[in-house]
């Protein structure tokens, strides 16, 4: 009888550990090296595929970065963006906000390589996050450490929310700051993330209002003439691939040239001019224009914050076998 109480306490303690374990599994969190036991080569496979695809199709690296934003800003980093219209799901890719997005077909190449190594293990949501990280490196941007994994995939899409949650090309700076703030991203990181425009482009349909019938006075005059050559019609075909790059000097490099351009009034969008002049953001713009290392530091921080937006973890969602369809 003397030992009954200690054994009872020990049994109770073990029960608590079991309950904690169950709770932890059902309510997991993102962590570093999540696949170290279940699929040790996962991150290396993704990196290799991103590199291979980049050398065959250079613009895939830009697509991976854009995918991260479009996926994570809409509700969750859960690969809902990758779902095609099928089995009662309406694809987010149908939204006007997704105009110009491409290279979704190459996600399947990455997923197939992972499925061959570790079937039904690595989520499409983690592919979105890690391919963005590795794509940034291919674009000569920062090598971002501390990208956590363990996301799970949604079982549906949020097409009805895309128009509300993805900023429009002509949204105000205040609106964009509010959007990022709502997912836990501060102003400094927001300014840095907008630096992704360094490798972006804007279709003429979204910028001609700054050129016709009169030129926006905030635009550098010589730059405005260049844009009119790129976009010669005030009413461009909305489906035509007519565009201008944000950065003419280093269009495929994630660097601080974007900030130098907007300080010289050579930004494509209204928000570019606001970013360089608004007292909330102008100091960050000036500092990033002057210091590429500082820009890379803040850009890395912004990407980490963005990639951890409201993920599905534990027993939420699923691990899709094909990123285009729910299981």
Curated annotation (Swiss-Prot):
EC number: 1.11.1.7
Domain of life: Eukaryota
Cofactor requirement: heme b; Ca(2+)
GO MF term set: heme binding; lactoperoxidase activity; metal ion binding
Induction (UniProt): Late induced after mechanical wounding. Enhanced expression following incompatible bacterial pathogen attack. Expressed under a diurnal rhythm (circadian clock control).
UniProt remark on cofactor binding: Binds 1 heme b (iron(II)-protoporphyrin IX) group per subunit. Binds 2 calcium ions per subunit.
A UniProt-annotated Pfam family: peroxidase
Site residues, Transition state stabilizer: 66
Binding of Ca(2+) 2, residues: 198, 247, 250, 255
Function: Removal of H(2)O(2), oxidation of toxic reductants, biosynthesis and degradation of lignin, suberization, auxin catabolism, response to environmental stresses such as wounding, pathogen attack and oxidative stress. These functions might be dependent on each isozyme/isoform in each plant tissue. Might function as heat shock-like defense protein. May be implicated in the systemic acquired resistance response.
Family in the record: Belongs to the peroxidase family. Classical plant (class III) peroxidase subfamily.
Protein name (Swiss-Prot/TrEMBL): Peroxidase 21
């Amino acid at each position: 009888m003397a030992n009954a109480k200690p054994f009872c306490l020990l049994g109770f303690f073990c029960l608590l550990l079991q309950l904690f374990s169950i709770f932890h599994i059902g309510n997991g969190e993102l962590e570093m090296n999540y696949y170290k036991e279940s699929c040790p080569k996962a991150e290396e496979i993704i990196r290799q595929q991103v590199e291979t695809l980049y050398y065959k199709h250079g613009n895939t690296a830009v697509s991976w970065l854009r995918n991260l934003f479009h996926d994570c800003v809409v509700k969750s980093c859960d690969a809902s963006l990758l779902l095609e219209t099928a089995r009662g799901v309406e694809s987010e890719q149908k939204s006007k906000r997704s105009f110009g997005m491409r290279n979704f077909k190459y996600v399947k190449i990455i997923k197939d390589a992972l499925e061959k190594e570790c079937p039904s293990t690595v989520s499409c949501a983690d592919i979105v996050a890690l391919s963005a990280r590795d794509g940034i490196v291919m674009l000569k941007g920062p090598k971002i450490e501390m990208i956590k994994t363990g996301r799970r995939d949604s079982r549906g899409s949020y097409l009805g929310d895309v128009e509300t949650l993805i900023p429009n090309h002509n949204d105000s700076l205040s609106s964009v700051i509010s959007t990022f703030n709502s997912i836990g991203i501060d102003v400094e990181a927001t300014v840095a993330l907008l630096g992704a425009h360094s490798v972006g482009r804007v279709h003429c349909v979204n910028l001609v209002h700054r050129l016709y019938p009169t030129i926006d006075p905030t635009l550098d005059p010589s730059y405005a003439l260049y844009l009119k050559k790129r976009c010669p019609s005030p009413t461009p075909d909305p489906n035509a691939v007519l565009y201008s790059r944000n950065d003419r000097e280093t269009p495929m490099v994630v660097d601080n040239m974007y900030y130098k351009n907007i300080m010289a009034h050579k930004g494509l969008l209204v928000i570019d001019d606001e970013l360089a002049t608004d007292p909330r953001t102008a100091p960050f713009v000036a500092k990033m224009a002057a210091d590429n290392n500082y820009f890379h530091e803040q850009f890395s921080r912004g990407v980490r914050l963005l990639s951890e937006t409201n993920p599905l973890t534990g027993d939420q969602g699923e691990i899709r076998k094909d990123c285009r369809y729910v299981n």
